[in-house]
């Protein structure tokens, strides 16, 4: 059979399964608690801010918009036509013009230097900017309106070279080993390590090695120049893209930290350990500053070793990464759950630890006490069995009462997203309660937050951990490249994903989210009556998916 026939037959089978389960879902709906449909008010933005994102991926752009909406912030993005599209970089000149025209109109702007300099994160892995390009951008950034606050961020290149670079990627292991050895020699001065470094260098073509080194040299030069622009109203943040505790990215971070200390810029410049989540962290920091609120967060780990665990693609251990993000946002660590505004429940599943019913019951007890809990659900091997969520579902934990949830593939991405959601939700709730908001507005906030949580569950757990691995296998079996989808294959793949996630949304609603009230006040209980999802692939690959979640709410007098 041809590839087209196989895909068509597969789509028909999926459609039939969807139809059967849709009917089953309608029947299951009868099992949900009865409630009267409720039309909730849409949240009204209190302020607009500007975001020039790291790239066009939803997690860097539209997700930040959704987080902002939780806190009453309208996040303005550049026109989509200006932004990157997978292998096509952003139109840097148009982006700069957009920024120059709009920056002075808003009190706060979050600006990715990598998008302006390279055209996005993927382009930054492929392109080495010239000193002339760097100096020109630094000059443009310096000329932005000083009367408006800016948060500019730049990302240190990752340890591994891009898979798109040939022949560079053929020497991936040798380059990684070279990077780590070079840093260890810098730290220790060891003669034995120096000898091993020289042997490793000899295995790499000179042009490939020079290109690899130049990426960090260019990054160091630009970042140290960016450091000079730091003021109280122009904050600078440096991130690390897919790093490790040792390597050239670590050496670059040490240079930046030394310069920050030497120039006494600790209040104006920060270093953090991630990339995709930086805009969400900076959004949260601005909100907390505007609210004059320094929340306290209690860090609770599912296992004794989790705090000191080294997770994949992280430059520091779990505890250090969390404290770094709290400091960056302007939050502090609480010593007890009772003194905290938010509990950060941290799961780091790995070969030695998998969560069980014990952890699920512990989390439910926290929710029963009325604690606001943000769940960071991380897996060292990117396996569903290492996550908390399956245990929560199996033990009927009230997931709809979580303040936040995230389970990205990289720990800092998960922690940054969950902390941002949890703090923005708790902060906005605090504002509304202080202002004496009515029950309807409070319910609308709880419902909006649950909508965001449902989206993260559907993407981080159901898509990334369950659908994505099998989808990759199916595509490869049909001779389709999962990271280079043709237009027709992309459409059929989107249909497949839509069917799978629609079923999971129905199941999630009827098995958990819709079975208990997500909010109760003044003798009224508020339930999730419906949950549906729209899906598409933002780029011609299956690595990420763009979701739009819709929910309906009902009320019941208890």
Residue ranges and their predicted role:
Residues 35-558:
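An N-terminal assembly and electron-transfer interface module characteristic of large anaerobic redox
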Residues 1-6:
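Short, Lys/Arg-enriched N-terminal segments with co-localized hydrophobic residues
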Residues 15-29:
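Hydrophobic membrane-insertion alpha-helices, especially the h-region
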Residues 25-39:
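N-terminal membrane-anchoring alpha-helices
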């Amino acid at each position: 059979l041809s590839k087209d026939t196989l895909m068509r037959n597969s789509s028909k089978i999926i459609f039939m399964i969807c139809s059967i389960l849709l009917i089953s879902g309608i029947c299951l709906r009868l099992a949900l608690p009865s409630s009267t449909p409720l039309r909730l008010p849409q949240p009204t933005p209190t302020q607009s801010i500007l975001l020039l994102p790291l790239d066009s991926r939803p997690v860097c752009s539209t997700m930040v918009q959704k987080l902002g909406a939780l806190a009453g912030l309208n996040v303005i993005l550049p026109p989509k036509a200006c932004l990157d599209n997978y292998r096509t970089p952003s139109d840097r000149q148009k982006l700069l013009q957009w920024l120059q025209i709009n920056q002075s109109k808003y009190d706060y702007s979050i600006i990715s230097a990598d998008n302006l300099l390279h055209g996005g994160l993927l382009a930054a892995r492929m392109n080495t900017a010239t000193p002339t390009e760097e100096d020109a951008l630094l000059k443009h950034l310096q000329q932005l309106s000083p009367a408006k606050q800016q948060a500019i961020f730049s990302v240190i290149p990752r340890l591994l070279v891009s898979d798109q670079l040939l022949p560079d990627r053929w020497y991936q292991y040798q380059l990684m080993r070279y990077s780590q050895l070079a840093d260890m020699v810098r730290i220790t001065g060891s003669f034995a390590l120096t000898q091993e470094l020289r042997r490793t260098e000899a295995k790499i073509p000179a042009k490939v090695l020079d290109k690899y080194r130049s990426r960090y040299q260019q990054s160091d030069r630009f970042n140290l120049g960016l450091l000079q622009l730091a003021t109280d109203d122009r904050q600078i943040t440096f991130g690390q893209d897919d790093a490790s505790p040792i390597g050239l990215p670590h050496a670059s971070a040490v240079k930046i930290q030394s310069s920050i200390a030497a120039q006494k810029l600790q209040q104006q410049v920060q270093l953090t350990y991630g990339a995709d989540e930086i805009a969400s962290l900076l959004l949260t920091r601005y909100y907390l500053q505007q609210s004059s609120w320094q929340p306290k967060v209690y860090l609770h780990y599912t296992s004794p070793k989790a705090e000191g665990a080294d997770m994949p693609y992280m430059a520091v251990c779990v505890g250090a990464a969390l404290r770094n993000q709290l400091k960056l946002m302007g939050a502090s660590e609480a010593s007890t759950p009772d003194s905290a505004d938010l509990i950060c429940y941290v799961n780091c599943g790995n070969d030695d630890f998998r969560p069980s019913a014990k952890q699920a019951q512990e989390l439910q007890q926290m929710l029963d006490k009325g604690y606001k809990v943000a769940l960071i659900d991380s897996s060292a091997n990117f396996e569903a069995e290492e996550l908390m969520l399956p245990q929560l579902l199996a033990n009927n934990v009230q997931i709809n009462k979580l303040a936040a949830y995230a389970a990205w593939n990289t720990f800092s991405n998960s922690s940054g997203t969950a902390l941002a959601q949890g703090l923005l939700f708790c902060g906005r709730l605090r504002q509304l309660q202080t202002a004496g908001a009515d029950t309807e507005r409070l319910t609308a906030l709880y419902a909006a937050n649950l909508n965001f949580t449902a989206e993260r569950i559907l993407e981080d757990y159901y898509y990334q951990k369950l659908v994505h691995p099998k989808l990759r296998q199916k595509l490869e079996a049909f001779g389709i490249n999962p990271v280079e989808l043709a237009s027709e294959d992309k459409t059929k793949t989107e249909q497949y994903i839509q069917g799978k996630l629609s079923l999971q949304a129905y199941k999630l609603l009827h098995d958990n989210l819709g079975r208990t009230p997500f909010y109760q006040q003044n003798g009224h209980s508020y339930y999730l009556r419906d949950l549906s999802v729209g899906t598409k692939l933002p780029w011609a690959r299956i690595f990420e998916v763009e979701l739009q979640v819709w929910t309906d709410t009902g009320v019941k007098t208890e």
